[in-house]
Regions:
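C-terminal segment of classical bacterial N-terminal signal peptides
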Residues: 27-36
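Short proline/glycine- and polar residue-rich coil/turn motifs
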Residues: 126-138
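Beta-sheet-rich sandwich/jelly-roll-like modules and their strand-loop junctions
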Residues: 36-125, 145-155, 159-206
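Sec-dependent N-terminal signal peptides
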Residues: 12-25
Length: 206
C-alpha cells in the first residue's frame, strides 16, 4: 500500500516538474523575439506622423550643388541608436522625404569627438518619391530592399548633391557633411561642416 502511494506521489511530482520545465522553455522562446527586435534596426525611428519639415526644396551640399557625404550622427526619434548595434546585413532601408530625389547609400565610421569620418562601403543607388501631398496630416514612409553588410558601431550615410530626406526643426551636429563625397576605403577625414537637420533614414537588419 505504501509503495502504491509512493508511486502515485512520484508520478504527480514528475508531471508537475515537466509542466514547470515546459513553462520555462516557453517563456524563453517568448522572450527571444523581443530581444531580437530590440536590435533589428538602427538610425532614425520612422513612422507616418514624422514630418519632413522645411526639407523642400531639396537642400544642396554646396552652391553650385556638388555631391557630398552626409553621416547620420543623431537618430531622429531614436536617440542613442545612431550606430549599428551588431554585425549583420541590412535588408531594407526606410526614409521620409519631402520631395523626389536619389542618393547612394553608404556605410560610414565616425569619431564624433574629433569631427572626423570615413566611408567603408557603398550600397545601391536609391530613388525616392517624397510626399504626394505636402498638406497631408500623415507622411509616406518609403521602403527599399537592399543587401548591405554592416559592422557593429558603424553609421548610416548617403552620397548626394541634394536631399529632402530631412527634418529641419532644431540645431546641433545632427549630420557630419563631407565635400566632396567620400569614397570607400579612404582614411578618416575632417568634416567640412555640420548640419542641424536630421537625416530621416532607418536601417532594418536581415
Amino acid at each position: 500500500m505504501t509503495n502504491s502511494k509512493t508511486i502515485k506521489t512520484n508520478r504527480r511530482l514528475g508531471r508537475r516538474l515537466i509542466l514547470v520545465l515546459a513553462l520555462g522553455v516557453a517563456t524563453v522562446f517568448m522572450a527571444a523575439p523581443a530581444s531580437g527586435l530590440a536590435a533589428s534596426t538602427f538610425g532614425a525611428k520612422l513612422n507616418k506622423n514624422i514630418q519632413p519639415s522645411n526639407s523642400t526644396p531639396a537642400q544642396p551640399c554646396t552652391m553650385p550643388a556638388k555631391s557630398c557625404t552626409r553621416i547620420e550622427m543623431d537618430a531622429y526619434n531614436n536617440a542613442g541608436h545612431e550606430r549599428a548595434p551588431k554585425d549583420g546585413v541590412i535588408k531594407k532601408v526606410k526614409l521620409i522625404a519631402g520631395g523626389p530625389g536619389h542618393f547612394k547609400l553608404q556605410i560610414a565610421e565616425a569619431k564624433p569627438g574629433k569631427d572626423k569620418g570615413r566611408v567603408v562601403r557603398n550600397g545601391p543607388r536609391i530613388d525616392y518619391n517624397g510626399q504626394p501631398n505636402g498638406n497631408s496630416l500623415t507622411y509616406d514612409v518609403e521602403s527599399f530592399p537592399v543587401h548591405v553588410p554592416v559592422e557593429k558601431g558603424q553609421y548610416l550615410a548617403i552620397s548626394a548633391k541634394k536631399t529632402s530626406m530631412l527634418r529641419c526643426s532644431s540645431g546641433g551636429p545632427n549630420q557630419f557633411l563631407f565635400t566632396p563625397a567620400l569614397s570607400p576605403g579612404g582614411p578618416f577625414q575632417t568634416l567640412s561642416y555640420t548640419d542641424g537637420c536630421w537625416l530621416l533614414l532607418e536601417a532594418v537588419y536581415q
